[in-house]
């Protein structure tokens, strides 16, 4: 066993290295130091690195992204070089601001654009032709091609999860998984997307997200969705395809919304939505009146009908007469 490990790995002061002559397919490697992947790893294999206080954990598996050589000089033959600030890999056609940080273990593909003060953490893959605005922080994340990430976005940070132990102390739950973002996704400024705890947080292809949106851990969002500003989606919620959420819509945790649902602004989803259609209110209910603008109750709906039927000049005259009569002495 020891001899086979020596043929597979070599150890130096810089970490644990996979020998170039080795043709083994490594599935899981647990190491206490950084692991550098050499050129003999098969193509279309990605690295998922989970760091802890005790040791680093690296899992290798198939993915849509190429695993790139991360030797000290980069992989010049494939057009990839090592970024001087952080040691991450980037394609020579990518445009990266000099103040950006690309950590070791991150990969930036061709024609990507990274703005000023961008921080790309380890275990991150930036797809082709992705545009990332200034002051953005991304880690533990896989971003597809042709995505647009606006200023100040945070992707891949810890999710919000705590529990009380036997001693009454508040203990943080481990948040060790990743965020997966599809192709042609646009994310507005100052939006936050948490990484998963028991499953990856996923955003489907062609989904568009406005500014100041919060997406919790373990959330799964389908393709071609539209989220307006200040939407909040709690952890472990599931949203189907072609779903539109108006401004300040709130979705509680562990609920499911089917495809082709539209939610009016300021609505709150407290239970599963199983039928396509238009919803609104608190809690959200399905719109049944064709002319109603999600009236809060029947009286408000009837008053709206009366106001539509009365001419505006007559309505104003009645208001003035009522004000005059109220001022008259008895």
From Swiss-Prot:
State the superkingdom. Eukaryota
Q: Where in the cell is it found?
A: Mitochondrion
Q: Where does hexadecanoate bind?
A: 210, 214
User: What is one cellular component GO term in this UniProt entry?
Assistant: membrane
Q: Which UniProt keywords apply?
A: Acyltransferase, Lipid A biosynthesis, Lipid biosynthesis, Lipid metabolism, Mitochondrion, Transferase, Transit peptide
Listed pathway(s): Glycolipid biosynthesis; lipid IV(A) biosynthesis; lipid IV(A) from (3R)-3-hydroxytetradecanoyl-[acyl-carrier-protein] and UDP-N-acetyl-alpha-D-glucosamine: step 3/6
Site positions per UniProt: Participates in a stacking interaction with the uracil ring of UDP-GlcNAc? 9
Enzyme class, broadest EC rank: transferase
What is one process in the GO biological process aspect for this record? lipid X metabolic process
* Positions in coiled-coil regions: none
Q: Which residues bind UDP-N-acetyl-alpha-D-glucosamine?
A: 160-162, 218, 236, 254
Give me the reactions it catalyses: a UDP-3-O-[(3R)-3-hydroxyacyl]-alpha-D-glucosamine + a (3R)-hydroxyacyl-[ACP] = a UDP-2-N,3-O-bis[(3R)-3-hydroxyacyl]-alpha-D-glucosamine + holo-[ACP] + H(+)
Q: What is its EC number?
A: 2.3.1.191
Q: Which GO terms describe its molecular function?
A: N-acyltransferase activity; UDP-3-O-(R-3-hydroxymyristoyl)-glucosamine N-acyltransferase activity
Which residues act catalytically here? 217
**Complexes and interactors:** Homotrimer.
Q: What does this protein do?
A: Involved in the biosynthesis of lipid A, a phosphorylated glycolipid that in bacteria anchors the lipopolysaccharide to the outer membrane of the cell. Lipid A-like molecules in plants may serve as structural components of the outer membranes of mitochondria and/or chloroplasts, or may be involved in signal transduction or plant defense responses.
- Which family does the record claim for this protein? Belongs to the transferase hexapeptide repeat family. LpxD subfamily.
- What name does this protein carry? Probable UDP-3-O-acylglucosamine N-acyltransferase 1, mitochondrial
The scientific name of the source species is: Arabidopsis thaliana (Mouse-ear cress)
Name of encoding gene: LPXD1
